[in-house]
A protein has these predicted regions:
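A short, N-terminal "cap"/entry segment at the start of jelly-roll beta-barrel domains
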Residues: 1-53
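Double-stranded beta-helix
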Residues: 2-9, 101-126
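Short histidine-centered beta-strand/loop micro-motifs
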Residues: 32, 50-57, 74-75, 83-85, ...
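Short, charged/polar surface micro-motifs in flexible loops or helix N-caps
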Residues: 36-38, 45-49, 67-71, 78, ...
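Residue-level recognition of conserved beta-strand positions in structured domain cores
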Residues: 42, 74-76, 96, 104, ...
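Short, conserved beta-strand element in jelly-roll/cupin
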Residues: 57-72, 76, 113
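Short acidic-glycine-tyrosine-enriched beta hairpin
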Residues: 76-96
Length: 126
């Protein structure tokens, strides 16, 4: 495959590195790999992720909702949470170092643009 050939976005991850280079690699089961730059990946989520939140120390995360709807739950400075519905056609920015999670009530196709390589997860809900 040449360097300018398209790849199937449903099956691949795009890494946009801080040094200005990029590459693609096939998706693997489980969480996405972490790169020194941004990981761009597309998922169709059918259920709420099992962890109780994550945060990114390297920058803001961008969510682009392609279809469906979900709720972004962000921790607030006063110890509470803020819930924001995000729908097909919406872009939503999660600020750097903000604990957040998604609640999925219907299938939701989202493109994630995630800074890396640092990411932290809280424990499993339940």
């Amino acid at each position: 495959m040449g360097s300018h050939d398209p790849v199937g976005f449903a099956d691949n991850i795009v890494a946009l590195l801080r040094d200005g280079t990029s590459f693609t690699q096939p998706k693997q089961p489980g969480s996405s790999p972490r790169f020194d730059g941004f990981t761009v990946v597309s998922y169709v989520l059918t259920e709420t992720p099992p962890h109780d939140g994550e945060r990114h120390a390297d920058g803001d995360e961008l969510l682009l909702v392609i279809s469906g709807e979900c709720v972004a739950v962000l921790d607030t400075a006063d110890g509470g949470t803020e819930e924001t519905p995000i729908r097909a056609g919406d872009a939503f920015v999660i600020p750097k170092n903000t604990w957040h999670r998604l609640v999925i009530d219907e299938p939701c196709h989202i493109v994630f643009v995630t800074p890396g390589p640092q990411m932290e997860h809280r424990g499993l809900r339940g």
